[in-house]
Amino acid sequence: MEELMAKPDIRVSIAILIHQNKVLVGWREADQHQGNKYEFPGGKVEAGESPINACRREVLEEVGLDLENYFKFDFIRHEYEDVIVSLNFYFAYVKAADLDKIKQPWTWYRRDELQDLNFPKANKPIIKRLNLLKKIKISEDILQLNQLEEGQYLYWRPESIDQASQLLAQMNPNFLSRLIVNIDVWKGLSELQQKMVKMVQLKHHQVMKMQISDLIQGISYFASCHDQESLWQAQRIGCEAAFLSPVQTTESHPEAEAMGWKTFANLAQKSDMAVYALGGLKSTDLATALQYYAHGIAGIRYM
């Protein structure tokens, strides 16, 4: 009986490079493994090399960028017919000053455009994670999770942190991937629940006092920001998205001065994160928000 040969197991590091909420994508040639498909920058981890150093080296060699901060994004182990790949994903933000250094033929794509590109199968969960929805409903009522429209997340703000895990246990676990909770709530959840929620939110004061080392690598963080300083700080520590508020006067915080769409646009277009407009908005304001460089909108009363 012919002895079966074990499939090679290859360690790979891959970079998700982001600039102004767009992702850098290339093309795999026909003679490469999984050729004639789109790809993110990256390559094999060499013997004795750490995955993050491999990522940094590959980006320098392939793209021409020597970036300082990489944040762990995900880990995927995928079995093809001929090989097993262990994929270490990292993400990094690219400054405007570095754009001219990028080698050809890399191209920037919007997050929602990625789902229309033919990537290797192992990348499918990453494409899904990068394609952030456009609307976020904010509520204290966890039952709203069962009533979300298509294309919505729920940012849940429970009255009692202590009961959060018990309440979530009563919900359909398939819906947790559309849930955002504050870090204090997240810490009280079960390990399984922590893995299933979409993002962990940081309040403004939490963002401003945190350092890169305070964030758990591989977790998606969503910051609450009110100005240029907090947006910059959120991006610096590795947040992937942010609320920017208040755009308009709100019933919940009438004393807060509204920034208006012009100021919002000026701040949002300078950020590399996915920025959501928040404050005095209703669902029909999405088209306006997109014109002013928002990735999407969020609201309490009208979502």
Label the model's feature ranges:
Residues I136-Q144, E150-Q233, F243-P246:
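Catalytic beta/alpha-barrel core
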Residues I76-D100, D112:
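Active-site-adjacent beta-strand/loop module that shapes the phosphate/pyrophosphate-binding cleft
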Residues K203-Q211, A241-E255, L281-M303:
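Glycine-rich phosphate-binding active-site loops on the catalytic face of alpha/beta enzymes
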Residues L179-K198, K209, H226-I237, F264, ...:
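Catalytic cores of alpha/beta
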Residues H19-E62, R178-I180:
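Conserved Nudix-box catalytic region and its N-terminal flanking loop in Nudix hydrolases
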Residues A256-F264:
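Charged helix-capping and loop-helix junction motifs
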Residues K37, L99-Y155:
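Nudix hydrolase/Nudix homology domain
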